[in-house]
UniProtKB/Swiss-Prot annotation:
It comes from Bos taurus (Bovine). One of its GO terms (cellular component) is cytosol. This is Tubulin-specific chaperone C. GO terms for biological process: post-chaperonin tubulin folding pathway; protein folding; tubulin complex assembly. InterPro entries: C-CAP_CF_C-like, CAP/MinC_C, CARP_motif, TBCC, TBCC_N, TBCC_N_sf, Tubulin-bd_cofactor_C_dom. Residues 1-56, 139-170 are annotated as: Disordered. Supercomplex made of cofactors A to E. Cofactors A and D function by capturing and stabilizing tubulin in a quasi-native conformation. Cofactor E binds to the cofactor D-tubulin complex; interaction with cofactor C then causes the release of tubulin polypeptides that are committed to the native state. Belongs to the TBCC family. Residues 170-322 form the C-CAP/cofactor C-like domain. The keyword Secreted does not apply. The modification N-acetylmethionine is found at residue 1. Residues 18-50 have a biased composition (Basic and acidic residues).
Amino acid sequence: METGGLSAAALANGDLGSQRERTLVPERLQKREHERQLEVERRKQKRQDQEVEEEKSDFFAAAFARERSAVEELLESGESVERLEEAAARLQGLQKLINDSVLFLAAYDLRQAQEVLARLQAALAKRRQELQPKKRFAFKTRKKDAASATQVASAPDAPAAEGSLTSPPPLKEEGDFDSSWICGFSNLQSQVLEKRAEELHQQDVLLTQLRNCTIKLYGNPNTLRLTKAQGCTLLCGPVSTSVFLEDCSDCVLAVACQQLRVHTTKDTRIFLQVTSRAIMEDCTGIQFAPYTWSYPGIDKDFEGSGLDKNKNNWNDVDDFNWLARDVASPNWNVLPEEERRIQWD
């Protein structure tokens, strides 16, 4: 009887086990099918995203080429102020197109576009100078010699031979603007130097061979270069295109721009607003923080510069001397928050 009872119990348990397995099989199949559907959807979404990115890149390439061609044609035949102003307006549009495309453009394509834009900006500045050099520098409130309109202004109370720059040093990359570098300071030490909006508007500014100086640029330059500076503080309003920094040490900068390029520079802090990215090469001890300088009228200068004040990639830095993507570059770091509290004025 017991044997029969055990056999019956075993059979009953076996039936229950089989029933449980039959119940679990559909659950496993359903789970597997659900995972398969999720994977299909993920791949589909990935394909769609890729197609959207390709469409955006194609649109950018076509729009950029069209506007570039139009600007080049205007500059080649720019025998009137009106045509040059049209070229300037189109360049502002090109700049906005680049700014709006930063997130989906490949790094190489972005650099190429920025270099083309910088060259066109330089060509525009040169054509403006050729067409109306006197009118460009005839400021009503200035009390300088007429001769000073063709050279870089010297600092207050500094001899003209010391503070003015008549032949800028050779530039090593796309910033080679030659005679358009006609605004700035040079060969000065331990001075406070300033330029206002009417002097800076869409100018190419060159600051070179300065030591222990504080430079304040209240306005909207086209480009800005600081070279061979030591122990200087540079505060600048929004720069429409690029800021170049080279051969500098122990400096502090507050700059807003479309692109920042830093070469052969060390032990420098940069408070940055940049709509694309910062690029550095042959540098050490560089620290980055968000741009915090302000002055009356800066919002208007941002508007005129074409920069998006709400877009800031201050910590998106390409170090050309550091190719390892999974390890942070030892040549730069983010400035700690407790060290960012600076009273600029």
